[in-house]
From Swiss-Prot:
Coiled coil: none annotated. Residues 136-139 are annotated as: G4. This is Elongation factor Tu 1. Its main location: cytoplasm. The lineage of its organism: Bacteria, Pseudomonadati, Pseudomonadota, Gammaproteobacteria, Enterobacterales. Belongs to the TRAFAC class translation factor GTPase superfamily. Classic translation factor GTPase family. EF-Tu/EF-1A subfamily. Residues 10-204 form the tr-type G domain. It comes from Photorhabdus laumondii subsp. laumondii (strain DSM 15139 / CIP 105565 / TT01). PROSITE patterns: G_TR_1, G_TR_2.
Amino acid sequence: MSKEKFERKKPHVNVGTIGHVDHGKTTLTAAITTVLAKTFGGNARAFDQIDNAPEEKARGITISTSHVEYDTPSRHYAHVDCPGHADYVKNMITGAAQMDGAILVVAATDGPMPQTREHILLGRQVGVPYIIVFLNKCDMVDDEELLELVEMEVRELLSQYDFPGDDTPVIRGSALKALEGDAEWEAKIIELAEALDSYIPEPERAIDQPFLLPIEDVFSISGRGTVVTGRVERGIVKVGEEVEIVGIKDTTKTTCTGVEMFRKLLDEGRAGENVGVLLRGTKRDEIERGQVLAKPGSIKPHTTFESEVYILSKDEGGRHTPFFKGYRPQFYFRTTDVTGTIELPEGVEMVMPGDNIQMKVTLIAPIAMDQGLRFAIREGGRTVGAGVVAKVIA
């Protein structure tokens, strides 16, 4: 089967469904693809095509995820749906499927349930910037007041986790009825699509963000100086610009005097490219793997942060035993391991393989970091967990 050429005409936005088990996330995913295909063109995906999600590996962790695509007149959406609760936790923490916004599915027949709360909290911790609510199964609730009550509960829950509950779009619909072709409920899916278009801003492209390059290797070239290599994570570096070297040691400034790719000289290096950057007046032993080159002032080194972490189960090749406070693993950021100590939340004595947990981490050396930075937890080179920086402390 030949792959279709990907058309880059429209802005591309990543979204996904979140919410409690059996509230209708997968049915809604199928309904969106079906109704939008019927209305604006594109491919419909049936419920069972989405439900038996293929397994994939992200950072050594097995996650089942379904990816579907759909279009509105103004945008192209890539949408993820996970079959099981554990898959959501892993997906959101590893960032395997980054979301520019999420559709929170809440069954009007049940109202908010434990996983509703947990997914909202995870969204807050891992930096999902926008949430839209789809109140599902509204065809099964005759009482208007009950719908009002459920909507109010969901809004309060969002506000509790620092999302703007009062301003969040809430669409009342029935994914199943829409999927069956009932025009009244199909209209609600179009309303949801319009909310996605208007409420989730177009994401800033990596190339428009401040320059950052994680350093993978450092070479000394006689007569020319020091070259660092790596893949530009975001932004652009131009020859002649000042850059900072951040992390592990004290931050220093230097100037980029050359950029090369595949032994060709360029005048700039752009997001996504593997490049060598020549630095003026910097000695080979002043730089090491694990530091980053960055636009001056755009990122700071930190040692202490709150994180949301998933600990691999034994079956995933993780630990066989729990760990306790005082645990000192390595934290792998971008290109290097740094040892750190952990503090567990109050009342938590131990962490079992397969758990997800909030923990405070203190590293023995500073790393250039912002909220949302992903990391792996390793013991002797073996991955035992995955995490994300939820909040920088110091």
